[in-house]
């Protein structure tokens, strides 16, 4: 490992959609043969040669491109309104993925707008409705059913991906998601953990601890739900060893997916004030690439990487500037793995290496 430390409707003219809402292989698939293809020394292998990506996983199971459409269903967050805390996480400005700042359009209209862009850009003609902004299980079950049903009523939507906090997934809501899974929709529960260290979670005002995440994963798995865990590299007070430990704790719970991205400083947050005062130093690009490549090597090949970096709108992003250059980051990850001669799962580490502070 690297030696790093750091302070519409379907596309026009598309053939008819078959098997609407069907996941053809809900059983666990074998991991892809990562890193096994021999490329010419002058060739540039795709990132999926090194990493088990969500896009490639869906392509293998559905036989065509499936793309997420982000949805803002006008939720709020219990860490903002007083139920769990006030002010939200120190790094959070949800305008970074809900930039309009106005009440969002209807779910159907958001999907229509998304499919027009995605279809033109990628050719995908089936979609997963990604409930993204704020806490997307923070409502009564009947309200959630109404919102999720609106998304699934679109003929080309094959499933749901629901982003939420680990302290906002009571049993009845997990049961609702399991109902959709039982109807053969693709269903992912995306849990925002960010760090497994309670000291860090308190420092960034998350409003929950690691125990809530642990319990949420166990309850989701009791119902056969797939879990994708969100993790941030570069949180205040953490170094490389914290990232390794958080990853291993997550993997020990048998999760199915991971989203990892760097901490970026956006306007309108307490982190932005700390950065301006010189109290927080963002990661350098080479540090992030080296660290996430270490994590990829430590991750078993069957785990699906839903995300390897994250961006924010240019008008909101303060630092680091490279967080606005998604493809530069992804290409850097690919090139680093190629240079190392490694790939996902090539350097598995046992959890007895954990630090416990």
Predicted regions and their residues:
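Distinct, well-ordered alpha-helical segments
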Residues: 141-149, 170-181
């Amino acid at each position: 490992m690297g030696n790093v430390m750091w302070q519409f409707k379907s596309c026009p003219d598309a053939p008819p959609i078959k098997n609407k809402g069907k996941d053809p292989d809900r059983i666990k698939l074998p991991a892809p043969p990562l890193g096994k293809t021999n490329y010419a020394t002058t060739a540039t292998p795709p990132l999926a040669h090194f990493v088990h990506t969500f896009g490639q996983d869906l392509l293998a199971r559905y036989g065509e491109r499936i793309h997420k459409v982000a949805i803002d269903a006008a939720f709020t967050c219990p860490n903002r309104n007083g139920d769990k805390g006030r002010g939200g996480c120190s790094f959070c400005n949800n305008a970074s993925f809900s930039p309009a700042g106005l009440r969002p359009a209807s779910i159907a209209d958001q999907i229509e707008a998304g499919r027009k862009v995605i279809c033109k850009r990628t050719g995908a003609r089936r979609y997963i409705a990604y409930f993204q902004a704020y806490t997307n299980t923070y409502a009564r079950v009947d309200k959630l059913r109404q919102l999720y049903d609106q998304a699934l009523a679109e003929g080309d939507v094959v499933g749901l991906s629901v982003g939420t906090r680990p302290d906002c997934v009571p049993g009845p809501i997990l049961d609702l998601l399991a109902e959709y899974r039982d109807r053969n929709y693709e269903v992912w529960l995306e849990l925002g953990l960010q760090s497994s260290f309670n000291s860090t979670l308190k420092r960034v005002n998350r409003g929950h601890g690691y125990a809530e995440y642990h319990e949420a994963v166990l309850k989701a798995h009791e119902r056969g739900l797939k879990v994708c865990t969100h993790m941030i590299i570069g949180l205040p007070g953490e170094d490389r060893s914290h990232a390794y430990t958080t990853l291993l704790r997550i993997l020990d719970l048998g999760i199915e997916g991971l989203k990892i991205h760097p901490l970026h400083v956006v306007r309108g947050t307490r982190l932005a004030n700390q950065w301006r005062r010189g109290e927080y130093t963002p990661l350098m690009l080479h540090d992030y690439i080296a660290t996430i490549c270490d994590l990829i090597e430590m991750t078993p090949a069957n785990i699906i990487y839903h995300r390897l970096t994250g961006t924010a709108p240019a008008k909101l992003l303060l630092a680091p500037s490279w967080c606005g250059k998604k493809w530069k980051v992804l290409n850097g990850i690919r090139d680093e793995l190629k240079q190392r001669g490694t790939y996902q799962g090539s350097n598995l580490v046992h959890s007895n290496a954990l630090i416990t502070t």
